[in-house]
Amino acid sequence: MRVTVDSEQCVGAGQCVLNAPEVFDQDDDGVVVLLRADPTSGTTRRSARRATCARRPRSSSRRTEPAGCADRHRCPVRPGPRTRGPADPPPANTDRRQNHRRDSPVTTADDTAARWLRRYHPAEADAVRLVCFPHAGGSASFYHPVSARFAPGAEVVSLQYPGRQDRRKEPCVPDLGTLADLITEQLLPLDERPTVFFGHSMGAALAFETAWRLEQKGAGPRTVIASGRRGPSTTRAERVHTRDDDGIVAEMKRLNGTAAGVLGDEEILRMALPALRGDYRAIETYTCPPDRRLACGLTVLTGEDDPLTTVEEAERWRDHTTGPFRLRVFTGGHFFLTQHLDAVNTEIAQALHPDRAAPAA
């Protein structure tokens, strides 16, 4: 039997397009294959892989989600087409999966939202909301550990941009303003509740732009946490997106956020580089008016040795809010947050629940 696997919905799938310990793809016959990177050896094994998520029991009339699957999402494991024999009964249109095939010409609002907004764990009915914006080349599953940490007390929504993982056949959005418009369209219909935005690197600028758009419609977040990014109107002459593939890989090595074994694997890079190039173009061509300000609180996190952002440049976020501002400097480089997970989680927890104890300075 052939199956289709949505990699970002399977626990253990890649944390990031290029950090991915496991990357799923399909061969020309539609058979799922697993590209497993071994950072210790720098090699990649390619093998057929059957899905690890349990399928819904056929005898049950009640829809149940397999363990590890996102709430409100279809099971990421779906049987492929089978040729019916003469003794088979005619197909009945009772299976909801038949109405949600990827090649269906009809796309509902729920289908569109599900492509953009990923929820890995259920949340309490009155939970606060945390919306997470990935960095350039990143994917929603980068924030799976964050979702596990804060659910069910928070509804953690991770954004999945086009051009990666299960959306890799969709074109990337190479303009950050356009991407913010599209995300705003998906977040605006959500029910009203206290909301915090968290974004790292490109995700920080995108969180800011989305928050500003939502504020214009009276639906902004309570707080934005911007990590690993200089103030929005502070620019540098960066042109990584115009480099050849080797040049983009060299930049990833410089930032030291990706396993060397992954960067040396041509097959994984073939899938990842289009998203990286598109995202770099979006953030490197982004401009922000110096008078664009949020009304909500703004917390900025930065690494003292980040080659993309000096502490002074991170401080310039202060000019882009009329609300409370806080800057916290960590040891480390651009991906300092992987070295300070507990401290970063403390910052997020304080933003989600400001009535509780304040984080250490």
Curated annotation (Swiss-Prot):
Q: Name one GO biological process term.
A: lipid biosynthetic process
Q: Where is the signal peptide?
A: none
- Catalytic class of the enzyme: hydrolase
Q: In which pathway does it act?
A: Antibiotic biosynthesis; candicidin biosynthesis
Query: In which residue ranges is the amino acid composition biased (Basic and acidic residues)?
Result: 62-74, 94-104
- Could you state a single Gene Ontology molecular function term? hydrolase activity
Region Disordered, annotated ranges: 36-110
Report the Pfam families cross-referenced here.
Fer4_15 (PF13459), Thioesterase (PF00975)
The alphabetical list of record keywords is: Antibiotic biosynthesis, Hydrolase
Q: Where is the composition biased (Basic residues)?
A: 46-61
SUPFAM superfamilies per the UniProt record, alphabetical: 4Fe-4S ferredoxins, alpha/beta-Hydrolases
Using the record's annotation, list all stretches that form the 4Fe-4S ferredoxin-type domain: 2-29
Catalytic residue positions: S201
- Per its UniProt record, what InterPro entries does this chain match? 4Fe4S_Fe-S-bd, AB_hydrolase_fold, PKS_thioesterase, TEII, Thioesterase
Tell me its EC number(s), please: 3.1.2.-
What the entry lists under PANTHER family is as follows:
S-ACYL FATTY ACID SYNTHASE THIOESTERASE, MEDIUM CHAIN (PTHR11487:SF0), THIOESTERASE (PTHR11487)
Instruction: Please give the family membership noted in the entry.
Output: Belongs to the thioesterase family.
What does this chain do? Probable thioesterase involved in the biosynthesis of candicidin. Could release the macrolide ring from the polyketide synthase.
Q: What is this protein called?
A: Probable cadicidin biosynthesis thioesterase
Q: Which organism is the protein's source?
A: Streptomyces griseus
Q: Upper lineage ranks?
A: Bacteria, Bacillati, Actinomycetota, Actinomycetes, Kitasatosporales
